């Protein structure tokens, strides 16, 4: 592939490739890169579209925030255009709900493939699904202004987008439980000290 080929650009996700390095960018800074089912499908597609020559994948978000997490439109009765609402999914069968969550999780699981090293470059807010997306990567380089938080419990949800397993592996069970149960912010100094962040760099 030639330098900086654009492989995919849809639904708030852009994938570019420069030889052995791919960059996946969340491209909706006006909404702080809030996440939706369409974005999750685009992330999963980005993983499938990676050329075999890629060895490093950098994940970043445009604007001041990496990702503010799930778009609040998910909790509106009408949900997202063309998507079943979360309320409708909750009323459906357990098997259907499990299948839908498994589909969403495809956006988060490919970052730990054994043929690549994935690096999340995280600035500003990384909340809920944004925190879980950063946790999906092998490494995290964070700006001094980073704010991680697992806010699902305050919404009556569980963090079911694969984030709890790597969180426990990084910081231990008790601290992971406390972070999830309280929904508090984890800032750069604590993130580096506890192993959530591999490196802290100045914010732009």
Language-model regions: role of each:
Residues 1-62:
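Conserved CoA-thioester-binding segment of acyl-CoA-metabolizing enzymes
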Residues 7, 109-204:
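Crotonase-fold acyl-CoA enzyme core
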Residues 12, 47, 105-108, 131:
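Short hydrophobic/charged patches on amphipathic alpha-helices used for structural packing
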Residues 29, 64, 145-147:
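A short, glycine- and basic residue-enriched loop/turn
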Residues 31, 53, 61-106:
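Glycine- (often His-adjacent) and acidic-residue-rich active-site loop
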């Amino acid at each position: 592939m030639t330098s900086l080929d654009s492989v995919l650009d849809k639904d708030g996700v852009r994938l570019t490739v420069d030889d052995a390095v791919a960059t996946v960018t969340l491209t909706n800074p006006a909404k702080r890169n809030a996440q939706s089912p369409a974005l999750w499908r685009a992330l999963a597609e980005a993983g499938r579209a990676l050329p075999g020559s890629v060895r490093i994948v950098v994940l970043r978000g445009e604007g001041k925030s990496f990702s503010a997490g799930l778009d609040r439109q998910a909790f509106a009765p009408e949900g997202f255009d063309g998507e079943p609402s979360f309320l409708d999914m909750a009323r459906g069968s357990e098997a259907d709900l499990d299948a839908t969550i498994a589909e969403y999780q495809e956006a988060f699981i490919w970052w730990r493939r054994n043929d690549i090293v994935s690096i999340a470059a995280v600035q500003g807010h990384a909340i809920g699904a944004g925190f879980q997306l950063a946790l999906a990567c092998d490494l995290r380089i964070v700006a001094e202004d980073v704010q991680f938080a697992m806010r699902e419990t305050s919404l009556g949800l569980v963090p079911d987008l694969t984030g709890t397993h790597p969180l426990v592996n990084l910081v231990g069970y008790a601290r992971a439980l406390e972070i999830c149960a309280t929904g508090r912010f984890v800032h750069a100094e604590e993130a580096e000290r506890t192993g959530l962040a591999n490196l802290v760099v100045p914010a732009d």
